[in-house]
């Protein structure tokens, strides 16, 4: 359990940091719009990094056949996390009166930033990350 928490720590830290700003400071992202861009991009990177660490654990129950499959799993699972995050913002706007989703184009841009962040991390994994050689 300790290894799973360590693997998910980057995503959890960014999630908690973002929750504080979204929940307690409703108008923070409206006043500082660049923070939304940065948080969605960093959220994609943090989710990708956490999922990569989780898939690399020896105790993880599913073994994928190769590195490319793990990278694909990281990117596609990050896509699910990005959609879930936008649902979270929608619920805050709808039921708590915040203003995080300024419209459909803003929501699509936020999702694209999360996927772009995850894509940047996956490119790092393909070209720059060290691999285990036997």
Model region roles, listed by residue range:
Residues 1-103, 108, 115-134:
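Bulky hydrophobic segments
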């Amino acid at each position: 359990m300790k290894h799973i928490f360590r693997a998910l720590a980057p995503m959890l830290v960014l999630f908690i940091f973002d929750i504080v700003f979204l929940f307690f400071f409703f108008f923070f992202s409206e006043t500082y719009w660049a923070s939304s861009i940065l948080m969605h991009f960093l959220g994609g990177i943090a989710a990708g990094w956490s999922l990569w660490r989780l898939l690399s654990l020896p105790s993880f129950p599913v073994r994928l056949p190769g590195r490319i499959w793990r990278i694909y799993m990281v990117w596609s699972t990050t896509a699910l996390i990005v959609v879930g995050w936008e649902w979270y913002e929608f619920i805050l706007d709808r039921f708590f009166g915040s203003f995080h989703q300024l419209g459909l184009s803003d929501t699509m841009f936020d999702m694209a930033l999360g996927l772009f962040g995850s894509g940047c991390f996956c490119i790092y994994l393909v070209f720059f990350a060290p691999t285990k050689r036997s």
